[in-house]
Amino acid sequence: MTPHINAKIGDFYPQCLLCGDPLRVSYIAKKFLQDAKEITNVRNMLGFSGKYKGKGISLMGHGMGIASCTIYVTELIKTYQVKELLRIGTCGAISPKVGLKDIIMAIGASTDSKTNRVRFLNHDLSATPDFELSLRAYQTAKRLGIDLKIGNVFSSDFFYSFETHAFDLMAQYNHLAIEMEAAGLYATAMELSAKALCLCSVSDHLITKEALSPKERVESFDNMITLALEMMS
């Protein structure tokens, strides 16, 4: 048990899917897993373990932003020995290369957060995912006929007050979208010798101002959930 997770040791499987929204974690457990069991609920941040096609897998919410995400990731790795962490979330696109409903694999994560500079003695950390997980995601997407978009994301500490004038510059550097956690997830996994990857479904396009309806968001997210579970099974 940790200050933020009240699961017993052994309740988490070595592979864990992460979502910012705990209700989305509950949704995945009920719709996609067999024998799903709630294993933690501190602060209503839910976690489940169950089976997908006979293989054990866990789910955990992590809240919003790098600070919240890295707390849960650290405790999952250090206390519960989780080895592979796959974040599935939504993002806002900033590049003409991607559109609504596209699934992005973040092969790098820049950030306006200071956390990685603090942990890396004020140097620039290359926050990148695990290659093996990335390869599995790519191969699984090919098998499922999913056109996976591959590029960098920008993990921002800001949801509303963001430097919109920087979008063109980010797109020039092959940043496809804005989200809020990948840079912290990757850095924590690197520090603690775990494997991590972030997949994001495009729910809004920050340049064209397009946005999915609530129904379309669910359908789009279901495709990413299937990809995530298939690559981990």
UniProtKB/Swiss-Prot annotation:
The keyword Transferase applies. It catalyses: a purine D-ribonucleoside + phosphate = a purine nucleobase + alpha-D-ribose 1-phosphate; a purine 2'-deoxy-D-ribonucleoside + phosphate = a purine nucleobase + 2-deoxy-alpha-D-ribose 1-phosphate. One of its GO terms (cellular component) is cytosol. A purine D-ribonucleoside binds at residues 4, 179-181, 203-204. Keywords: Glycosyltransferase, Transferase. Belongs to the PNP/UDP phosphorylase family. This is Purine nucleoside phosphorylase DeoD-type. It comes from Helicobacter pylori (strain G27). The gene is deoD.
